[in-house]
Amino acid sequence: MLNTTQQSLLVFIGVFFLIFGVDQAIKHAILEGFRYESLMIDIVLVFNKGVAFSLLSFLEGGLKYLQILLILGLFIFLMRQKELFKNHAIEFGMVFGAGVSNVLDRFVHGGVVDYVYYHYGFDFAIFNFADVMIDVGVGVLLLRQFFFKQKQNKIKA
C-alpha cells in the first residue's frame, strides 16, 4: 500500500507526463506545418528566444541553463516541503511538465515553440499550451492556498 507521499508523487509524475506529452504533440503538429487563421486567433509558428513576452532574450543560450537551475531548485525545495507537495501535486505536475517541455524546446529548436496569437481588439503575446498550463497551475495553487488560509482563520476564530 502506498503512503500519501508516494501517491502524491505518482499523481505528480502522471500529470507531468500528460502535460509534457500533450504540449510536445501540439508543437510537433505546428512544426509540421499546421496553421490556422481567424479574426480572433491565429495559429502561427514563432520561436521565442526569451521567456514571457520575450523577456530575458538577451541571455540567449544561457537562458536554458538558468531555467534548468530554477526547475531543479524548485523541485528540491518541494521535496523538502512534503505537505505543500502532497497538497498540490497536480498543480506542480502541470507547472513542471510545461516548464520542462519549454526548456526542451530551447535545446532542440533554439527557442520555445510558440503558436497561439490572439489579436482581436489588441495584439497579445504569442504563447503555447505549456504557458497556459503554467498559468493555470500557478493560479489554482494560489487560489487553493488563499481559500485554505481563509478556512484556517475561520477555524481559529
UniProtKB/Swiss-Prot annotation:
GO terms for biological process: proteolysis. It is found in: Cell inner membrane. Disulfide bonds: none annotated. GO terms for cellular component: plasma membrane. Keywords: Aspartyl protease, Cell inner membrane, Cell membrane, Hydrolase, Membrane, Protease, Transmembrane, Transmembrane helix. Signal peptide: none annotated. It catalyses: Release of signal peptides from bacterial membrane prolipoproteins. Hydrolyzes -Xaa-Yaa-Zaa-|-(S,diacylglyceryl)Cys-, in which Xaa is hydrophobic (preferably Leu), and Yaa (Ala or Ser) and Zaa (Gly or Ala) have small, neutral side chains. The active site is at 114, 131. Its main location: membrane. It is an enzyme of class 3 (hydrolase). It is a multi-pass membrane protein. Pathway: Protein modification; lipoprotein biosynthesis (signal peptide cleavage). PANTHER family: LIPOPROTEIN SIGNAL PEPTIDASE. This protein specifically catalyzes the removal of signal peptides from prolipoproteins. NCBIfam families: lspA. This is Lipoprotein signal peptidase. The lineage of its organism: Bacteria, Pseudomonadati, Campylobacterota, Epsilonproteobacteria, Campylobacterales. The gene is lspA.
